[in-house]
């Protein structure tokens, strides 16, 4: 019977949980601040993982850059802690990337809201 999710998907999901816990409890770099792991994409051979993150201070681009720099500098340490927490033959090499999807989703939502508001104003003026 075929599984609903591949092994890579299951490992990515577990990796997301472990990295979130590690970032919350273990990493003390002040550049990182409040970070959320939104998604993890892992290669089929489980050797590389792209970790998508968002920050509490999304509006400040320089703070986001500093946060990503801190995360990528700490990726070796995080990888070591992940290796201790998960039983994997090969612990994936971690690369942290800022997740633009939430910002883009909010921008699209604001555009739709503005169009609806303008349409309602125009409808009221016509009556």
UniProtKB/Swiss-Prot annotation:
Role according to the record: One of several proteins that assist in the late maturation steps of the functional core of the 30S ribosomal subunit. Associates with free 30S ribosomal subunits (but not with 30S subunits that are part of 70S ribosomes or polysomes). Required for efficient processing of 16S rRNA. May interact with the 5'-terminal helix region of 16S rRNA.
Localization per record: Cytoplasm
Keyword Glycoprotein: no
Gene this chain is encoded by: rbfA
One cellular component term from this protein's GO annotations in UniProt: cytosol
Upper taxonomic lineage: Bacteria, Pseudomonadati, Pseudomonadota, Gammaproteobacteria, Pasteurellales
Record's keyword terms, sorted: Cytoplasm, Ribosome biogenesis
Homology family: Belongs to the RbfA family.
Protein's name according to its UniProt entry: Ribosome-binding factor A
């Amino acid at each position: 019977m075929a599984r609903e999710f591949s092994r890579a998907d299951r490992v990515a999901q577990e990796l997301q949980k472990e990295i979130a816990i590690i970032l919350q409890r273990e990493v003390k770099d002040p550049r990182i601040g409040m970070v959320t792991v939104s998604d993890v994409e892992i290669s089929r051979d489980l050797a590389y993982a792209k970790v998508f993150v968002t920050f509490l201070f999304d509006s400040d681009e320089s703070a986001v850059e500093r946060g990503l720099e801190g995360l990528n500098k700490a990726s070796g340490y995080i990888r070591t802690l992940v290796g201790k927490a998960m039983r994997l033959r090969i612990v994936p090499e971690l690369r942290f990337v800022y997740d633009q999807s939430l910002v883009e989703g909010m921008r699209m939502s604001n555009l739709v809201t503005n169009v609806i508001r303008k349409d309602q104003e125009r409808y009221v003026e016509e009556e």
